[in-house]
Amino acid sequence: MDRSLTGPVKRSNAQAVAVPIGGCLIAIFSVLSYYLLLSNPGYFSHDELQWGARADVAHWRDLPWQAWTDFTAFQHRPLTFNLWLLITYAWFEQPALMHLLWVAMGLFNAALLFGCLKQLRATTLQSLGGAAAFAISPFAIYVHGWTATLADLLWLAAALALLQSVLRLPTESRWRAAFIALVFTSIGLLAKEAALAIAPLLLFAWLVSGRQPRLRAALMASGAVTAGYLWLRLPTLLYAPRPEGTYAWSLSMPLKRWAEMQLYPYLPTALEFASVSNASTTRFGLALLIAVVVAATFVIANRRIGATYLFGGAIAMGPPLVLAIGYPQYGYGYAALICGCGALAWPQLRARGQSVLLLALVLTSWHGYNIAREMHRIGAIQARYSPALADAVSAHRSRHSDTSTALRLALEVEADRGVFERLSRQISNYAGVAIGDQVKLVDRQQTHHAVIGADGSIRWAAGAE
């Protein structure tokens, strides 16, 4: 792209004061967030525990691999699933290593975004700012902190590597651009269906960048791979049986999903998208106001950057736009794109516009910290609860020959019911103990065998032992 994308730097006294203060706050939240992610002693949800059960085999050759050519599977993600099986087989019992790997992959994606911004002629400081804003965004913290998001890490890495590699080529270099696009689009689609967004994003990039030959060639190659993928997979994606609710789709959903993406970053206590709909009128209104002001700031700074923020951001969300339920990991690519827009728009903003972006960054970095803190809390609970649950199920089974008698557990803290439901859901086994449907969470007033403490420990009810 030409130099006009970044434009001349406009300095002000307000900037000289606001940038250091905002930067310090963002740095503090960043350090605290990644410390919490790296020191997390456990796991966030049932997904990791289910994969731990699948990978609990004697030898890695016995792992239940997904076939690379089974295009009838609802989730055809052989790159993700097979790599995840290997990682889980090796490190499931060492959560610290799992979290270290996820953070490393996440920061690698931030480094790829830095490289893309440099290729778009942003300064080193701008590029670093954009990459850092992405890494501390609530979307990224959610993905980097939950070790069930390998698919999101992989498809975005493929998309960013594609863009950076193509932008490094001479403008007229068509064949190399096409080959690069073919390879990385294929990698992305083998990782997650969200990579269907790569070709539309290349189309958008080609349109806003002066229709460069290298981007046109990349677009055609990526489009061909995407068309072939859809030819093989579209009937399955549209009509195959799927988990109830989670992957239901409707053409009435895109506006709602898009709105959630806009508002979620500015609701700093929200862990997942359900909190957007459940937010109070005041909090919802404030988030909406901030989102509108931020969007207007981009449009005023530069029309092309503003269009990329609004329309490119929607494209980056990809297929999840039509799903009935949204989750923060669906906004991972969106976060990379809008943070890149912020880096490119920064020098063209007046002091007021820069203050708006700084406020948004402080708010979103605080949000990211809150997510990291909650994930760390849940991880500490899981690290205690899962082994205790396996012991309790084993002890309960030894006293009840009738296997239809489920272990009934009450909660000490009812507010954490959702946490324990997720940590108990469809876990076939843990630490060699078969669990399956042998656990039932009940109200404290109902008959129960044991009580789950706030810290995840399990103590037997009076007379139950």
Task: Place the predicted regions along the sequence by residue.
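Polytopic membrane enzymes that build or remodel cell-surface glycoconjugates and lipids
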Residues: D2-E465
